[in-house]
């Protein structure tokens, strides 16, 4: 992660080789990374799409995880992670919960929403000072980590379905490869007066299977969730989110 461009091209190349500099630089970088990853095969090296500007398929051969952006605001991250997921698998996208007010935009979002957005990003984690959090927040983080452990394989290696996106809402669900689990997340950015109820249909489930959702305390058939769908909670608060996990019975 180096937060600057290469501006001073060395004088070591002949004039007719100056245009080869950046290509030669990349070959040298790959040579160094090949040595590091071979020498330390158990270390996960992460590249950076922000300062390093190195989020491409070439670097992924050596660094299979990339920090998607230094912008960690939950609302900003919706578009950042969605755009990144159009090209890269969720297992490669670094997505963390950070402190509020956010260090870049100053926004204050609920810990639950920050967690839900980061979990849907892929490689989930935290970057904040735990000593400054309340006991309630620490308990919530502990629960988030436990939840992510139960859905990590589905998020990182399942199928992602983008369900509903407007200027004010975002919804998506992951389905595990064996269709035994689905993870649904809905985000409402701003509360609106007299807003209509929002209806969302899931995708990718086993239509004949019965799924249990502990968050709702109900069971649903796959075709029911995909054809009838769910009504989103009518909660009047900004930056509201829900996460529903459906496990095949």
Predicted regions and their residues:
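Catalytic cores of secreted or luminal carbohydrate-active enzymes
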Residues: 112-162
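Glycan-recognition surfaces
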Residues: 23-131
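A glycine-rich phosphate-binding loop feature that marks nucleotide/adenosyl-phosphate handling sites
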Residues: 47-56, 134-138, 161-168
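Active-site-proximal loop/turn and secondary-structure-junction residues that shape catalytic pockets
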Residues: 2-8, 49-53
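Aromatic- and acidic-residue-enriched carbohydrate-binding clefts of CAZyme catalytic domains
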Residues: 4-30
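C-terminal beta-sandwich/jelly-roll accessory domains of carbohydrate-active enzymes
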Residues: 190-249
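Hydrophobic, well-ordered secondary-structure elements that form the walls
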Residues: 1, 45, 118, 184, ...
């Amino acid at each position: 992660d180096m937060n600057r461009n290469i501006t001073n091209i060395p004088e070591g190349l002949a004039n007719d080789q100056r245009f080869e500099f950046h290509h030669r630089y990349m070959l040298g970088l790959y040579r160094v990374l090949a040595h590091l990853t071979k020498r330390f095969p158990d270390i996960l090296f992460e590249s950076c799409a922000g300062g390093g500007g190195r989020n491409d398929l070439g670097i992924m051969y050596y660094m299979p995880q990339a920090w998607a952006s230094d912008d960690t605001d939950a609302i900003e991250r919706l578009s950042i992670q969605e755009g990144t997921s159009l090209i890269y698998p969720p297992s490669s996208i670094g997505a963390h919960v950070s402190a509020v007010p956010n260090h870049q935009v100053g926004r204050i979002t609920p810990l639950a929403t920050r967690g839900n957005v980061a979990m849907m990003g892929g490689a989930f984690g935290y970057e904040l000072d735990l000593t400054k959090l309340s006991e309630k927040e620490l308990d919530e983080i502990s629960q988030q980590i436990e939840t992510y452990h139960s859905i990590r394989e589905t998020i990182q290696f399942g199928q992602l379905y983008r369900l509903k996106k407007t200027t004010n809402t975002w919804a998506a669900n992951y389905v595990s490869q064996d269709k035994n689990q689905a993870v649904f997340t809905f985000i409402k950015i701003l509360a609106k007066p007299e807003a209509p109820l929002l209806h969302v249909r899931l995708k990718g489930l086993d239509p004949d299977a019965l799924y249990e959702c502990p968050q709702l305390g109900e069971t649903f058939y796959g075709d029911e969730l995909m054809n009838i769908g769910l009504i989103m909670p009518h909660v009047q608060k900004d930056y509201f989110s829900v996460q529903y996990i459906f496990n095949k019975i």
